[in-house]
Amino acid sequence: MPRRLWPFGQTKTSADEQALSEQIDPHRIPKHIAIIMDGNGRWAKRRGLPRVAGHRAGVESLRRVLEVCEDYNIAYLTVYAFSTENWKRPADEVNALFDLLVEYLHRELNTLHSKGVRIRAIGKIEDLPGGPRRELEKAIAKTANNTRLVLNVALNYGGRFEIVEAVKSIARLAAEGKVNPDQIDEKYMSQYLYTADVPDPDLLIRPSGELRLSNFLLWQSAYTEIWVTPTLWPDFGRKEMVQAIVDYQGRDRRFGGVKV
């Protein structure tokens, strides 16, 4: 079991997790893990609680996931916090989500910064409410030079929108004669995505049992290994995170090719 150098919380290691951790090959750790944080509403409904209670419980799951990222030297973690479609939810729920973002940054930023976490945002951040946007921008600026772990928070993010915006940027350059269309390939296209300086995810985790990408990292996930669990996000803990890594290491990643 790896030694936790800087715990975000005081989560205890279960016997199940310890048994799983013994199966992990430290030389085959995924560099980039992405997570669709799904199931907060259902978790709250099953307990007769308001939906915001599920979102609040989900914040603690993120804390546990960050612990595991530290333990196993994960370099990049990208979490789907708020999609471009989430604006369709009731206004009180949307407001509560952004209040939770501000609360989380106020409570955790100094700890994250002192431990070398760099916070980044991907999505149409300029359209976020003023207060949360400013707090997020402060966190991004404060942690900009950190290198221990990059935490990408997808806010007001949509995979299709991201691709369309990248295409529009390249089309403008082509119209101005600044790029030859024959120069445009996958690598060139990737430079115009929100994740331009981030490697594609090796592993995408989907709690709640849903079998869809939900418009998340569509371009980047072409060869990503996907791991789905019926566990709802607020119940997602260290054991589930370690299980995902173990299962990932059991996959044969071919990237479209065949071994001969």
Curated annotation (Swiss-Prot):
It comes from the Bacteria. The gene is uppS. The active site is at residues 38, 86. It comes from Heliobacterium mobile. This is Isoprenyl transferase. Signal peptide: none annotated. One of its GO terms (molecular function) is magnesium ion binding. Homodimer. The keyword Cell membrane does not apply. It is an enzyme of class 2 (transferase). Mg(2+) binds at residues 38, 225. One of its GO terms (biological process) is polyprenol biosynthetic process. Catalyzes the condensation of isopentenyl diphosphate (IPP) with allylic pyrophosphates generating different type of terpenoids. Belongs to the UPP synthase family. Keywords: Magnesium, Metal-binding, Transferase. Its EC number is 2.5.1.-. Substrate binds at residues 39-43, 51, 55, 83-85, 87, 89, 206, 212-214. Binds 2 magnesium ions per subunit. CDD domains: Cis_IPPS (cd00475). Pfam families: Prenyltransf. Transmembrane segments: none annotated.
